UniProtKB/Swiss-Prot annotation:
Positions marked as site (Transition state stabilizer): 27
Task of the protein: Catalyzes the transfer of the gamma-phosphate of ATP to D-galactose to form alpha-D-galactose-1-phosphate (Gal-1-P).
This enzyme's EC code(s): 2.7.1.6
Localization: Cytoplasm
Record key words, sorted: ATP-binding, Carbohydrate metabolism, Cytoplasm, Galactose metabolism, Kinase, Magnesium, Metal-binding, Nucleotide-binding, Transferase
Binding site for ATP: 67, 124-130
Protein name from the UniProt record: Galactokinase
Main location: cytoplasm
Reaction it catalyzes: alpha-D-galactose + ATP = alpha-D-galactose 1-phosphate + ADP + H(+)
Catalytic site positions: 174
Length: 387
């Protein structure tokens, strides 16, 4: 999307002149899934598909928002002095929640604005459209109101918006991946300490293919909160004998020795995924740094197997994509990415095999599921910026 088209769309929506244009990426997670709320490591990166926003200040205290992706919602209007949650406000609760969380830090919004949003992420694909719009709003407010909030603080405000305002008990990964993204680099983040480092994603002759199930998933309505509470209960039982703060504190061997304390087969499976996936994320980062792409791919695949058997968040659509991908020539590894229950998977595929990969996996998916999957090459992007 180019800025002149976006500005034209803004003018058509609001019948006024736009002032600034911003972009905020989506994200994929290479490995380390459902570990961010268990004190583990994640290894995500921002991607070049995401959300564009066009902004113009107003002289009154009215805020008007319009999304090209949800035209039926029309122009949603509220006042800067009333930032209370309103279910009927739909998608605008994400930017409104960011305003509310920023206002709690003592910021006073002294004027309103018009905000036009246009995303090019597939709908419901699990590429973090909510974190993308939160951090888009963050950079827009930070710039438009000259707030001087650090990018890391905007990331934390984004998570608060999701948890406290929207009501989804998510970890920090999505906002961190979107907000702190760097071109061609993934981020190894320790969610226990918030220590992070950047790692170049050097895949040789391979590319990351995003595989979209085209099965919608709503994070708030999924079993996400259930899995989180299962892990919290498993941790509580382990803490009766172990001095640990999170499941991410344990090695695989330590977990195996102590698993009897959990005394519930389902809870053991959930916790085992969190512990083993954390170790996989650490090992995968090292493998990538060592140019050991075979090991990296094997760990990516092992992640999906664990998410299927132990965490049970994959479902037929994601399993069909991953399991079919594993059988294709030139594939190093494949897995679901994101919360699961639909959304997207990723595969590490030899560039020269991508066309055959899309055709073969696409055919099996269509024959098995009854509708098409979509495939895109992921390009790793910078975090939010003004265009």
């Amino acid at each position: 999307m180019n800025t002149s088209d976006l500005k034209q769309e803004f003018t058509e929506a609001f019948d006024t002149k736009p002032e600034r244009v911003f972009f905020s990426p989506g994200r994929i997670n290479l490995i380390g899934e459902h570990t961010d709320y268990n004190g583990g490591h994640v290894f995500p990166c921002a991607i070049t598909i995401g959300t564009y926003g066009v902004y113009a200040p107003r002289t009154d205290t009215t805020v008007r928002m319009y999304s090209a992706n949800i035209p039926d919602a029309g122009i949603v209007t509220f006042d800067v002095n009333d930032l209370s949650y309103d279910k009927a406000a739909g998608w605008t609760n994400y930017p409104k929640g960011m305003m509310d969380e920023i206002a709690k830090t003592g910021v006073k919004f002294d004027h309103g604005f018009d905000f036009y949003v246009h995303g090019n992420m597939p709908d419901g694909a699990g590429l973090s459209s909510s974190a993308s719009i939160e951090l888009l709003t963050g950079i827009m407010l930070n710039t438009g109101f000259n707030l001087g909030i650090s990018q890391l603080d905007l990331v934390k405000i984004g998570q608060k918006c999701e948890n406290n305002y929207v009501g989804v008990n998510s970890g920090i990964m999505d906002q961190f991946a979107v907000g702190m993204g760097k071109k061609d680099q993934a981020i190894l983040l320790d969610t226990n300490t918030m220590d992070y480092s950047y790692a170049p994603v050097k895949l040789g002759n391979n590319v990351i293919v995003i595989m979209n199930t085209n099965k919608r998933r709503e994070l708030a309505d999924s079993k996400y909160n259930e899995r989180r509470s299962e892990c919290e209960e498993a941790l509580r039982r382990l803490q009766t004998k172990l001095d640990i703060k999170s499941l991410g504190d344990l090695t695989n061997d330590q977990f195996d020795e102590a698993a009897y304390l959990i005394n519930d087969e389902t809870l053991i499976k959930r916790a085992r995924h969190a512990v083993f996936e954390n170790q996989r994320a650490i090992r995968a980062t090292k493998a990538l740094a060592d140019d050991d792409l075979t090991t990296f791919g094997e760990l990516v695949t092992a992640s999906h197997v664990s998410l299927h058997f132990d965490y049970e968040v994959t479902g037929k659509e994601l399993d069909t994509l991953a399991e079919t991908a594993w059988k294709q020539p030139g594939v190093l590894g494949a897995r679901m990415t994101g919360a699961g229950f639909g959304g997207c998977g990723i595969a590490i595929v030899d560039k020269d095999q991508v066309d055959a990969f899309k055709e073969n996996v696409g055919k099996v998916y269509r024959d098995t599921i009854g509708y098409d999957a979509d495939f895109y090459i992921a390009e790793i992007a910078d975090g939010p910026k003004e265009l």
